[in-house]
Every structure is written in C-alpha cells, then in structure tokens.
C-alpha cells in the first residue's frame, strides 16, 4: 500500500513523544578538585521532570548543598525540573557528613569516594547512563583512566574511588597516607581473616572481594569508626591516633570484620522482610562476633561482655516498647538493629533445633534467598528443614506485642543460656543517662540533646524547654558524680518521688533544677551469657 505524505507527517508527529521518552539520560560525575565534583545531567527534549531515586528528607538535604552552574535545571523536592534538551551542571562540595545512605562525595587525600545513588534518576524519560570522569578511577574491581561507564543494570548504585592523578600501585585498595603502618596491617589482617573463615564456613555464599577504601577523618570527640560494605568497602577512622590503644584496636577489628561479613549476605534480598534492618545488621554483627572468637581476636570473656552489653542496651533503649511498636527512626536512632540483632541471632541460633552448625543454618537461609525464595526468617534459622519444629526465640521477640524486656525475660530462662546478674557500673551510667534524657523529653516538649564528657554531661538548652533554657554543663546530680557512682541513679529516683524535681550541679558553680513527675525505672538486673555453653551450641553439628 502506498502511504501518502499526509499520513507520513501524521505518523511522524504521533511518534515524536514516544521517541523523546525513549531517549537516553546521561549522568556524568566528574572529579574537578580535591574538594568538589561536577555532576551533569544531559536531558532529552520534552523531559521536564525526573524523579531522584534518593527521595524524601534525606535526599533533599543532600541536594540542598549542590551549587547550580547553569540555568538548565534545578532540584525541587524529589524532582529534577528542567525545560528539557539541555545539560544541567552542579558543583557538589566534598563532605564527610552522613545524611542518608552511602555518601556521595566523601573526601580522601588525593581524591574522593563517590556513590552514584546520590545522583540516581528514575528512567521515566528513558534509560539513564552513569559515567565517572577522573584521571584515575577504581570501579567494579577494575582501574580505569579518564572515563568509566557504570554497568547499565547497576549504574545508579555504583561506588567509585576517583583520584586526581593516575595511580601506580598494583593494588586497587586505597589507604589514607595519614594512617599508620600498624593500622593498615590490622585492617588487612582482619579483612583476610574474616574472608578466610567465612568462605570456609559459608560454602554456599557467593563472595566477591571488595576494594578497601580506608580514610582518616575528623569529627568532634575521640577516636571513632564508620563505614559501609558496597563494592568499594569504605572504612572511615575518625580522630585516629598514630599509636593505637586497646580501645582503638577493638573498634577497628569490629568495623572491618562487620563490614566484610556483610559481603557474605544479601542486603537487597532481605528488604521484603519487615525486620530487614535487623536481619542485615544483626546478621553482620553475628558473623563478626563469631568470626572474631574463632580467629582469636576476641577472648571468650570479651565476647561475652560484648553480647551482654548489646542485650542490656537493647533492653534499655527499646524504652518499654515491643519491637513492632518501634518506629524505623527509633530503631535507627538508637542502633537497635545492631544492639538487639546480635543477641537475637546468637540466642536463636544457639537454641536451634535439628542438625547442622549455626553457620550452616545461616548459609542455607541466604542460599534460599539467592534462589528467589522468601523463607520465614525465624523458621529458617531456628528449624531449618527439621520437621514438626516450632521456633521459640525469634517470633516472641520480633512479633509479640509485649515489651522487648518482657520477651527476653520469658525467652532466656527457657533456653537456659544466660542468667540474671546485677548491673555493672557501666550499665548504671547508661541508666543515669537514660534518666537524664527522660527528664529532658518531659521538660522540652518531647525533645532532648545531651553530650557526655569525662566530667559529666552537657544538656542542650532549647526554647521549647520549661527549665533548660540554655546549655548546662552538669558535673553532679543530687550531690553525686554524674557517672561512676552507684548511688546517682537511686538518688535521682528518690528526689523525683520526694520533691518531684531533680537538681543538677553545674560546672560553673550554678544549679539547675528540672521538674520530675515520674522517675525513670532503674533496672536491678541484666543477663550474663553462659559463653562456653552458648559457643558449644553454636558450633555443634
């Protein structure tokens, strides 16, 4: 059939929007200096609004720091709005501030750690392509020069190390030159040891070694650590000394082993579970904890102390709520996925029914996930393939309406792996801090802000507070030192009951009196694990 010119014109007009919407969106992430990236978005015609995949408050706060370099487009809420058919360019300052997810422009001497999720766009205008530009690029286990295109399937979820000059090292790992040789050696030892142990114990796992990016950084306070476990495994060491003490060595071992343990899990596959954060972070903690004992990085007594501390703080920080009643913000703000997750894994797997080691049960759960199955989490860990088996630890902990404290008090006597014990002074100090926070919440319309110091605690003054109008540095409470005194907690309780107020002695010689209607509940007992029995149960065939 012969098609007339009129029909050709109409057909072309009808196809224009389709072709426009199938055009490619190109995102270039370029290292332009030690303290900035230039990120550009090449937008096709008719593409006037594209959604950022990192949305809501965290994503918007990240984009608020971007500096427009032209008038092509601007972030508005969760959208990149544009007239279309132009390339929007933004200067993105380097920052160590963690806002939401992986950092987008984390500085390191000579370059920057970058993660494309901070610049990822929806594909509503067509496929989105991501490219890194720098003299030296490490991405997906390879080194590139000048330019590297991220894989199409994972482009919006790809980390990279961008360097200002070509690198000559045969290793892809990056170690900040400010870190001591001893620190670098410890990172390598713990990384290699974790990989060796878990590769043997989890034979069904598909492990690929990530590139290490160990970066020194600074923040208020003392030495601390942070990181994440993407294909470039970022380890951030804050205020790190050249000569490590026992505390720094312990923190570093925990960080490195935890992050490498994550590489034997599947982060995205557990997102279908309501307890995804606990499954992922608690699982990483469990692997780290057991590996550290078996590799000799933790003595049995140290492992017991870590487990007992995590459980005690899980009970304290759930604040009389059930796990289901806690909001994601409450869980994340108190790190409850770690604190509650570690003992949940340890005790549930130690009390498992049927044959096989705890790690074999763990391995089988993740193998099922890799095959596309969604096994019941509690059933998979506690029962496996054991017939007529009913899990006895995880369901009450994670699904009951009773408080976490009540559920632990029910579960632990049944499995006979821990016994009550009086609180240590460290736990008494934790309870004093929680009592101070409760006073602030009641006085300040639900808000609180405190900073611990060697001499006491700083209470942040806020306009919404009835009594705490300015920052107050408290060095005593009811005549007792804030921390380190077994009598401080009971004195707070007695003052609240007798006078309905609690008195703070201030560093400047003044006094702060805060109303108190209901005293904080000071616990008189926590749990001590039977470490020998528990480890024997975890390792039994």
Predicted regions and their residues:
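Bacterial N-terminal signal peptides
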Residues: 9-17
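Sec/Tat signal peptide C-region and signal peptidase I cleavage site
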Residues: 18-22
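Beta/coil-rich, acidic/histidine-enriched accessory regions frequently appended to metallopeptidases
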Residues: 23-42, 46-51, 371-541
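Zn2+-dependent metallopeptidase catalytic core
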Residues: 57, 61-66, 72-73, 82-97, ...
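Juxtacatalytic substrate-recognition/specificity segment
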Residues: 165-276
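Pan-zinc metallopeptidase signature
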Residues: 325-403
């Amino acid at each position: 059939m012969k098609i007339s010119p009129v029909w050709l014109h109409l057909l072309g007009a009808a196809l224009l929007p389709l072709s426009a919407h199938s055009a490619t969106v190109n995102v270039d992430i370029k290292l332009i200096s030690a303290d900035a990236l230039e990120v550009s978005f090449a937008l096709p015609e008719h593409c006037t609004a594209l959604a950022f995949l990192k949305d809501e408050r965290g994503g918007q706060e990240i984009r608020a720091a971007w500096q427009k370099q032209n008038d092509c487009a601007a972030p508005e809420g969760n959208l990149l709005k544009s007239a279309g058919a132009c390339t929007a360019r933004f200067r993105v300052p380097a920052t160590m501030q963690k806002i939401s997810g992986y950092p987008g422009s984390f500085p390191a001497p000579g370059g920057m750690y970058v993660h494309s999720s901070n610049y990822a766009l929806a594909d509503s205008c067509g496929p989105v392509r991501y490219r890194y530009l720098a003299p030296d690029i490490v991405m997906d286990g390879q080194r590139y020069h000048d330019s590297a295109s991220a894989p199409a399937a994972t482009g919006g979820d790809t980390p990279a190390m961008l360097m200002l000059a070509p690198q000559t090292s045969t290793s892809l790992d990056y170690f900040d030159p400010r870190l001591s040789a001893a620190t670098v050696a410890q990172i390598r030892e713990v990384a290699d040891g974790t990989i060796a142990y878990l590769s043997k114990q989890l034979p069904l796992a598909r492990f690929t070694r990530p590139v290490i990016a160990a970066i020194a950084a600074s923040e208020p306070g003392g030495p601390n650590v942070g990181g994440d476990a993407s294909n470039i495994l970022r380890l951030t060491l804050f205020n790190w000394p050249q000569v490590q003490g026992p505390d720094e060595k312990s923190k570093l071992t925990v960080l490195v082993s935890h992050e490498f343990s994550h590489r034997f899990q599947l982060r995205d596959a557990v997102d279908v579970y309501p307890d995804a954060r606990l499954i992922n972070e608690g699982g990483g903690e469990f692997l780290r904890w057991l590996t550290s004992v078996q590799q000799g990085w933790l003595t049995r007594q140290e492992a017991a102390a870590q487990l007992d501390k995590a459980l005690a703080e899980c009970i304290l920080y759930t604040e009389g709520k059930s796990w289901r009643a806690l909001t994601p913000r409450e869980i994340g703000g108190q790190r409850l996925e770690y604190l509650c997750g570690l003992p949940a894994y340890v005790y549930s797997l130690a009390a498992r029914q049927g044959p096989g080691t705890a790690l074999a049960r763990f391995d089988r759960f993740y193998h099922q996930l890799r095959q596309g199955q969604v096994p019941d989490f509690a059933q998979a860990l506690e029962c496996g393939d054991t017939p007529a088996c009913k899990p006895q630890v995880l369901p009450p902990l994670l699904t009951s309406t009773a408080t976490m404290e009540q559920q632990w008090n029910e579960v632990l006597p049944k499995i006979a792996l821990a016994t009550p014990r009086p609180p240590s002074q460290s736990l008494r100090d934790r309870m004093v801090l929680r009592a101070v926070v409760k006073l602030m919440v009641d006085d300040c319309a639900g808000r609180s802000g405190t900073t611990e110091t060697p001499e006491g605690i700083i209470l942040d003054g806020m306009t919404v507070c009835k009594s705490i109008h300015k920052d107050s540095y408290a060095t005593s409470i009811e005549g007792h030192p804030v921390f380190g005194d077994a009598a401080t907690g009971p004195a707070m309780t007695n003052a609240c009951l007798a006078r309905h107020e609690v008195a703070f002695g201030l560093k400047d010689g003044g006094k702060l009196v805060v109303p108190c209607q209901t005293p904080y509940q000071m616990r008189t007992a926590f749990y001590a694990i039977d470490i020998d029995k528990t480890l024997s149960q975890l390792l039994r065939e």
